[in-house]
Amino acid sequence: MIRELIIFTCCLIGLMSCKQADSNIHVHYSQKVNGYDVSVKILPDSIQEGYFSDIATRKAELTFKRDGQQLIVENPCYADKSLTAESLTSGMTIDYIPFEMSESGTFRGNQSPFFFFDVDFDGEVELLICLWEGMGYRGYHAYQAYETNVGSGTHQLSPMQEAPFYELNDYTEFDPINKTISIPQGVGLKMNGEKVYGLVDGSFTLIERVQYDWEHTKGVKYEPCAPTIYHYKIVNGTEILDRIEKCPNDK
């Protein structure tokens, strides 16, 4: 009797697990991206519609398969403009939205949920995952970068954690000629400044800090007014004031 009860309990747990697994929503992209077949497993209880915009965001697990390699990435803020909360059904096949770099060298205006891009100027592309509206502002996204040269087999990827790659967003500016990455600080109605990282001896290091001073703009109502900009060079870990750009309205 006890043996039968144990078997029944195990079967019940198995059925419950299958039911829970079946509740996930599976989506597949019709095109290969950088040679990878891409599928997405969405957790249905995580869907948030219209928090910052009319695009639904949700927790998801993305899988990239190519030539015996399987890469798995988790995204807490996955979104695709092809998917809405109302139309979302398991087994859907959707078209991939290609990535386009802006003319300013930033990700601004990007609508792609993921793409491949050489973030560290080494000639090989990394996987970029879009955290939809992850900056906390309507229509502006954060990004996580992943290295993909991990060999064959199945790999649960972790994002690149070293600076500046852990704070990429729509305003991040890439300069492949000078091999610099500029990270904005205090993004909102008025930015506080930016940090500039340069490639030195094969690794990125902070080479400049830019500070925006908006104090003189408080009384200006009707004419355009820019901040006073302080440029600091970083030399052996020490900040040295390099130059000051003053707004014409700064008396």
Predicted regions and their residues:
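Acidic, small-residue rich beta-repeat scaffolds with periodic aromatic anchors
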Residues: C18-Q70, D175-K251
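Beta-propeller fold detector
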Residues: V73-C77, Q156-A163, L206-D213
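Short, surface-exposed coil-to-beta transition loops
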Residues: Q111-S112, L128, G139-Y143, E167-L168, ...
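Repeat-based blade/solenoid architectures
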Residues: L83-S112, A163-T172
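Beta-propeller blade termini
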Residues: H28-S30, N110-V119, Y166-S182
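Beta-propeller blade repeat segments, especially FG-GAP/WD-type strand-to-loop junctions
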Residues: K65-D67, R138-M160, V196-D201
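Acidic/hydrophobic-patterned starts of short beta strands in beta-sheet-rich repeat architectures
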Residues: V40, V119-L131, P176-S182
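Bacterial Sec-dependent N-terminal signal peptides
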Residues: M1-V27
